[in-house]
A protein has these predicted regions:
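Flexible "cap/lid" loop of the alpha/beta hydrolase fold
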Residues: 142-150, 157-186
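Catalytic histidine-centered segment of alpha/beta-hydrolase-like enzymes
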Residues: 278-287, 291
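Acidic catalytic loop of the alpha/beta-hydrolase fold
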Residues: 251-255
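Conserved alpha/beta-hydrolase catalytic His-Asp/Glu region
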Residues: 169-174, 184-239
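Short beta-strand/loop motif that positions the catalytic acidic residue
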Residues: 240, 246-248
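Conserved HGGG/HGGXW glycine-rich cap/lid loop of the alpha/beta-hydrolase fold
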Residues: 54-102
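Active-site loop/oxyanion-hole signature of alpha/beta-hydrolase fold enzymes
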Residues: 49, 94-135
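Alpha/beta-hydrolase fold catalytic core
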Residues: 3-64, 89, 130, 299-302
Length: 302
């Protein structure tokens, strides 16, 4: 029997969702995806000056803290295939970003880059996290890099999984068209095409999570902040002296695999690899390899 405890969403995030009915439908889909969580978890709401942060927590209380930042519009439930591996040893904290579909609730409009750091610092302080491992997927990779550049004393190791707008900018071309069409004009057919372009193994994605992805775009106000996230400069990236893991799929339509080579040349302490037969959704496409590389990196293995 798998269970959750704690936070039930009562406040409305009208800065993200189109209306209360749309929000309720999305939250129901979020909870349906949570049924896929293979380990016990706690849902916790953290009050901050910017709004309420919703955090999914799994793993032994004595474990070293590992923070997970999800991809755009995916919410923390996107980690359902991976959380079982990560939480065996580590105390895992998966945080819903404040300005995207999820259970976090914003007090105001979108955050600027300084406010993003302040918000995360408030969340980490209230969770009692002074030093932790930090992993980010896709947009979460940019967030994790941005945070670490300003708080390197708090991050033990940094893990970047298919990090968009981090080493290179996204090139809008025919490869990215399906994903863009779904974002701009969401319907179920465009969702299918988008998923097929982002994943090499779309059949591995549970229907419950696909439904949540659909409602996370369909039932929310358009958010194109990812296009305003500037790639980091060579000097900024070179200042990351902590150990960094960079993983990119060989069929990632949002990242050129050459960023692995670029990371190897710029980052002082890096473990970078191209994951074969994986798209942008590499945590699903090649779950076993990605999880093994993550855990080996965390455990100090090369």
């Amino acid at each position: 029997v798998f269970f959750g405890c704690g936070a039930s969403k009562t406040a409305s995030n009208h800065f993200v969702f189109t209306n209360a009915k749309a929000e309720k439908k999305y939250i129901n889909s979020y909870n349906n995806t949570l049924k896929l969580w293979p380990v016990a978890y706690e849902e916790r709401d953290i009050t901050t000056s910017f709004g309420t942060a919703h955090v999914l927590i799994s793993g032994p209380k004595s474990g070293e803290p590992l923070v997970l930042l999800h991809g755009m519009d995916a919410s923390s439930t996107m980690w359902y295939p991976n959380i079982g591996d990560y939480s065996k040893k580590y105390r895992v904290y998966a945080i819903d970003y404040l300005m995207e579909p999820g259970k976090s609730v914003s007090k105001g409009d979108k955050l600027n880059t300084d406010e993003i750091i302040s918000w995360y610092n408030e969340v980490f302080a209230k969770l009692g996290l002074e030093r932790f491992y930090l992993a980010g997927m896709s947009r979460g990779g940019w967030m994790a890099t941005h945070y670490t550049l300003h708080s390197q004393d708090k991050v033990k190791k940094l893990m970047l999984l298919a990090p968009v707008q981090t080493f290179n900018g996204i090139e809008m071309d025919t490869k990215t068209m399906a994903a863009a069409n779904f974002k701009f004009f969401p319907n179920r057919n465009r969702l299918k095409k988008a998923v097929n372009s982002l994943s090499r193994r779309p059949e591995k994605i549970d229907p419950a999570f696909k439904e949540q992805m659909y409602l996370g775009v369909k039932n929310t106000k358009s958010n194109f902040d990812v296009l305003q996230m500037a790639p980091f400069s060579k000097d900024e990236l070179a200042s990351l002296t902590l150990p960094v893991l960079v993983l990119v799929g060989d069929h990632d339509i949002l990242n050129d695999p050459n960023i692995v080579e670029k990371a190897g040349k710029i980052l002082p302490d890096v473990n970078a690899a191209v994951i074969e037969d994986a798209g942008h959704f590499l945590t699903i496409d090649q779950k076993e390899e990605v999880d093994k590389r993550m855990l080996d990196f965390l455990n100090g293995k090369k």
